[in-house]
A protein has these predicted regions:
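Hydrophobic packing positions in regular secondary-structure scaffolds
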Residues: 1-126
Length: 126
C-alpha cells in the first residue's frame, strides 16, 4: 500500500509542533516508515521539519536523513550540533555515513568525526 500525505495529517503535525506536543508527535510518527516521514518533512517548512527531526530518536532519524532531498538534508544538518550529527552517523552503515559526512564543510566534518563514539566507524567513514 502506497503512503499518501493528507492535508489533514500535515495540519495535525503543524498543530502538534506549534503546541510543542513532542509525545504525541512521537506516537503519530513512530510506526511510520522512515521514507514516509522524509516525505512528510519535505512538505513542512524547515523549522517544522527540524523540530520533528529533533523529537525523534537517532535510530529513526538516521534513516530519514538518507531519504531527504539534498537541500532539506543540508538545512537540517546545519541546525544540528556536531554531537547531534555524530549521533546520526553512529546509527548508519559506513558507506551511508561517509556520503553524509562528505556533504559537510571541512571544519564541521572534523568536529563531527571527533564526536563519533565508535573510533573504528570514524576511521572507516573518512
Amino acid at each position: 500500500m502506497e503512503f499518501k500525505i493528507s492535508k489533514q495529517l500535515i495540519q495535525e503535525l503543524e498543530q502538534l509542533i506549534q503546541n510543542k506536543n513532542d509525545q504525541q508527535l512521537e506516537v503519530l510518527l513512530n510506526d511510520m516508515h522512515h521514507a514516509d516521514i522524509a516525505e512528510i518533512l519535505d512538505e513542512l517548512d524547515f523549522n517544522e521539519a527540524t523540530y520533528i527531526f529533533k523529537v525523534l530518536d537517532s535510530e529513526k532519524t538516521a534513516e530519514i536523513l538518507l531519504e531527504l532531498e539534498d537541500d532539506l538534508r543540508e538545512n537540517i544538518l546545519s541546525r544540528l550540533s556536531p554531537k547531534e550529527i555524530a549521533e546520526e552517523l553512529d546509527e548508519l552503515e559506513t558507506n551511508d555515513a561517509a556520503d553524509i559526512i562528505a556533504e559537510l564543510s571541512q571544519d564541521l566534518k572534523a568536529e563531527v568525526i571527533s564526536e563519533l563514539l565508535d573510533v573504528e566507524h570514524a576511521k572507516d567513514i573518512v
